[in-house]
Amino acid sequence: MARENAFYITTPIYYPSGKLHIGNAYTTIACDVMARYKRMRGFDVFYLTGSDEHGQKIEQKAKEMNISPKAYVDDMAEGMKKLWNTLEISNDKFIRTTEEQHKKVVADIFERFLEQGDIYLDEYEGWYSVPDETFYTETQLEDVERDDDGNVIGGKSPDSGHPVELIKEESYFFRMSKYADRLLKFYEDNPEFIQPESRKNEMINNFIKPGLEDLAVSRTTFSWGVQVPSNPKHVVYVWIDALTNYITALGYGSEDTSLYDKFWPADVHMVGKEIVRFHTIYWPIMLMALDLPLPKKVFAHGWLLMKDGKMSKSKGNVVYPEMLVERYGLDALRYYLMREVAFGSDGVFTPEDFISRVNYDLANDLGNLLNRTVAMINKYFDGKVPEFKGEVTSFDGELQTTANNAVKEYEKHMEGMQFSDALKQVWILISRANKYIDETEPWIVAKDEGRRNELASVMVHLAESLHAAALMLQPFLTHAPKKIAEQLGLGEEYGLDWGTIGFGNFPENTTVVKKGTPIFPRLDLDEEAAYIRDQMANGANAASSEDETGDWDPNETDLVSEKEKQIKYDVFDKVELKVAEVKDCSKVEGADKLLKFRLDAGDNGDRQILSGIAEYYSEPEQLIGKKVVIVANLKPRKMRGEISQGMILSAEYDGKLQIVEAPSEAPNGSSIS
């Protein structure tokens, strides 16, 4: 059982099927905030994140790229780690489900379930979505396709909209129904287990009370996964493989179980609302079958949406965190994500809201308070923070009360993972301190030598307020609190020690900096909002320090067409023409007539088109940056071993071909009619 001062928090492990966006960062930053808060309060924290690296989708992607699944996930895992480093995530471990120790324990657990009779062998038939790794019944499908007799012959996943396929295969099943009553009793005895409360009602009413169906826990149609030792043609399916990462990462089932003994059960599994069922039904039941303690809490947060719904490259509304960090700094992103949305609810990202938060909260309220305070202490007290002498002015007591209440409410909200509310308390203090300056009018008091004590009290009260704000901001912002402490003349050891919070603790005669540098410069709202929208529209908001051409695979691009997709080449009456920007152009090795284009046509990623015009362009680089016209809905085909995802229009005259150019101001992906 975990020791009293231990705290274990986890993100879901991410599936490495594509570049992570701001929504993934939202979950991971939230966990990081909680981990940093608990460390600040003296807890011994273990923060886990990682990657879920098995499954049919990964096997297929690797095959398309002509590399091994292991090589594919190795590359994707490194990309994840790089992003977490950029966001300064303080995780203690990054687990990968391809680790040998994890695979061994997963196989052992599967065999134990089998021996206990919790798992049985049967046959399964159902509609399966590869990207979602989920089976669906006919009644769950969307956009159902039927034959002339009314039989279902296809459809789409209700979760993602991806096409499904009918699969019939032998599978092992877990007897979920065996544990349904025990799970309900656990919910009753542990009312805080599922947060927010609405998620618990959803699980009970939609899944448990109607009758828990037994769960398919193995597959035979792919091989990239953990083999079942007693029946090697079966691969352990995602539920047992992925969910057990939370205990295998701590050494469960290994020779060294010291971390498991200390930190399990988990204090918090942080998940998105779309996977709450797996963590609050499947995972607890598996732990019951293993006779292990259940997690203390599963917190299912909402989605970070755009005004036009979920993020989608096809809509041109995906935001990658690297771009925001590079242009505005990490603190701005972390603050916005935790402040803008009530944690647990859905929130909407807009460029205008993001820039406004930075300007009003960080630059105006916090930044100006720090700048004014440092400047006045330098001007009136030669840079020395005066001694705290309690309530001297008629406004001192109210500011102290505001600070004390803010700290108390902040602690309550942080414990409940209501991060937006916790930050509101910090800004209540900051706003009150700014008002305190206007009330006390230090520039007038300074003219009267007989009011020197009042002036000194104002200065130290402002310094104390900023110190308290910096301490409360530590879990959220990884740079600004240190800068505030430095400008106030406090060393990091004292200035960022939670035990020093409270008025009367500021060291007398501390020397502030001579001139503080603004920690959050003001931004031009219109200019910066336009910049972000441009990055979203053009799909160029990946980290600019990264070479885009390095690991791009056109097979991963989700081609977007408003007309019927993938028509055959002889059916041109349905042709769709689009504007595309040339991002790269080069000759195809071993093919004298072919040029290979990388194009931004407003798709879910860049597309690749091969065109037989090499003899007319001796320097293909000259085409980079041009806007061209493409046939967007041709079925992709292979040419000289390369995928070609459309056709570039060219005009023929005097026996030569020249690319048809679109207007330079036309947005990428716009239709031509």
Swiss-Prot record:
Enzyme Commission no: 6.1.1.10
Pfam families referenced in this protein's UniProt entry, alphabetically: Anticodon_3 (PF19303), tRNA-synt_1g (PF09334), tRNA_bind (PF01588)
Any GO BP annotation: methionyl-tRNA aminoacylation
Catalytic activity as recorded in UniProt: tRNA(Met) + L-methionine + ATP = L-methionyl-tRNA(Met) + AMP + diphosphate
Description of how the protein assembles with itself and partners: Homodimer.
Enzyme class: ligase
Annotated ATP binding sites: K313
Protein name (record): Methionine--tRNA ligase
Domain of life: Bacteria
Keywords attached to this entry: Aminoacyl-tRNA synthetase, ATP-binding, Cytoplasm, Ligase, Nucleotide-binding, Protein biosynthesis, RNA-binding, tRNA-binding
UniProt short sequence motif 'HIGH' region, positions renumbered to this chain: 14-24
Coiled coil start-end: none
NCBIfam families membership: metG, metG_C_term, PRK12267.1
Predominant localisation class: cytoplasm
Organism whose genome encodes this protein: Oceanobacillus iheyensis (strain DSM 14371 / CIP 107618 / JCM 11309 / KCTC 3954 / HTE831)
